[in-house]
Amino acid sequence: MASMNTHKPDWLRVKAPQHERIGYVADLLSDLNLNTVCQEASCPNIGECFAGGTATFLIMGPGCTRACPYCDIDFDKSVRSLDPSEPERLGEAVKRLGLKHVVITSVNRDDLEDGGASQFVSCIDAVRASSVETTIELLIPDFCGNWDAFKKVMNASPNVLNHNIETVPRLYKRARPQGLYKRSLELLRRVRQESPNVYSKSGLMVGLGETDDEVLQVLSDLHDNNVDIVTIGQYLSPGTKHLPVDRFVTPDQFQKYKEEGQTRFGFLQVVSSPLTRSSYHAGEVKRLMQIYPR
């Protein structure tokens, strides 16, 4: 499979925004010694999000115990203790940034008995203690199928529970070798089962070698497992050691994914565009919660 990384189309070229807020957010994160997935995963939207005073916090990192070949987060299989001050620092950042909606994600921590579920809970508690009106979205790993760990997170009552399906099942062995497609679907199905009031969310990348029909089948699977919100974005290879881009999906095709997701499958929201990432414009969920209250 040949890489297309050197032929990036115009619709994927992002101008670096000039805004004093970007420096403020970056300095605050540095002062509080907090990681963001925006920085660690080289997100193309980092300038826009920082300019808007938002960030997706990456806890328990920065190293990940899995080495998915599409991801730019550093691999680190060493056993590392959790930082007990991290939740408090995260809560302080949310307060100082005045966030109305916060996204908290993590690296995979397969070295921990509960996969880091307890740290997620502590972060939820810290955010609610420092900023009671802030809605909370979690983007969680699969916890290796540890459903007790999953229940621990659900019992903390996040407003949105996100777990990314990432790609089509045919490509799992290549792109997500330590993940299981059916296990991820099972996790998403359990969101509604455990907490009917929590909105469930999942995202996938295109451009890894899937077909459009396979994308639609994933949408069908997500719908069948009670997912409310879906994000679809273009895969961009972080470097030569990562999986190459197989194709650049056009904006028109992304619009077709969105239309299919909303009209055929009836998701509450489908965010689909070349630069969409799982937490891009995540704050719009507050409007969604007003339209579809639970």
Swiss-Prot record:
Keywords: 4Fe-4S, Cytoplasm, Iron, Iron-sulfur, Metal-binding, S-adenosyl-L-methionine, Transferase
EC class name: transferase
GO molecular function: 4 iron, 4 sulfur cluster binding; lipoate synthase activity; metal ion binding
Any one Pfam family match given in the protein's UniProt record, by short name: Radical_SAM
Chief site of localization: cytoplasm
Listed SMART domains: Elp3
Family: Belongs to the radical SAM superfamily. Lipoyl synthase family.
Descriptive protein name: Lipoyl synthase 1
Gene name in the database record: lipA1
